[in-house]
């Protein structure tokens, strides 16, 4: 008998599943007989419980299991016979009108959409390019020096000097202070501290507080008003004005290490050669610039593909991805040490837009890959693993680590497929190259 597939919408379908009752009953009887061999009941030895008693106790459970299995098997058979590309899980409901000799169920489900990808020649992509020169290397060296800063008491002579004749606190100094804060002459939580250190100019303290500390010398005090921002994290004081008295206890000036052989050795250059150090920094910056530009252009390519593609998105797949994103959010909370993160009440609705984009993009990419043979080749995967491993001390061990886990390899395969798609689209789209600084590139990629 031919199966009738009803169209309920653009993607929603329904078919009727009919299961002969005698076939179902035979399976129920067979399972109960098998179950009876191991059933234990008071007053009977194992396997000696009368079949009728086993049936009385377990027939309902066994019938439900058999129907579930048979419905699933029959739906699979129908979907193959009708070439249905089912998206997500179907729902099964018994029909209101049942025949005497058969069970009847309605299976409602969605199918994968037809994906229409427009003319790639109309897609527009801006591709960032970055050059790494001496300026970028010098800026990186400045950052590395600041990460290794040492502080010395201002005004006290030492091997690196005394910080100058002026002993007042300046931007960049690490100061240690006592402070007392009050609102309407009443102390408040967090408003008082002793021997509190911070670096002037880093922005750790509110601007009024830093301004008050600037110019003070050890032993000096200053009283000032400070208005807490309306969005201040301490809700009890947000938007209120407090009066603070700050006492300077210690002032230390920053000493940055010289760029010499010892500095180079601290960066892993064994012989302390400064030329090698700069070459390695340049190589690392170029690798990072490549990673960032690839990430930015990938996002632009994906946006361009979505713009020129037409498709309906199965709700079932969106809902599945919403739940996946909820679980990812809970895992993230758990990694941050949030208690009971696995049960955190995160509403799936907050991920609706993100999930729809992810599913839509996945369908578009799958169509593009299939139509143009953009699958990842083993040699491409190995090349990416090798490139990733270069930034580690023992690249061979990293390669072994990757190839010892199928999930990690699958993630790399997905990355290669995306790269193939990006290269394919860039070869056909309207691409505009734009030179950007490394700093601008870093800022853009962090916002992407």
From Swiss-Prot:
Residues 172-257 form the PPIase FKBP-type domain. It is an enzyme of class 5 (isomerase). GO terms for biological process: 'de novo' cotranslational protein folding; cell division; chaperone-mediated protein folding; protein transport; protein unfolding. Its main location: cytoplasm. It is found in: Cytoplasm. Consists of 3 domains; the N-terminus binds the ribosome, the middle domain has PPIase activity, while the C-terminus has intrinsic chaperone activity on its own. NCBIfam families: tig. This is Trigger factor. It comes from Burkholderia ambifaria (strain MC40-6). The gene is tig.
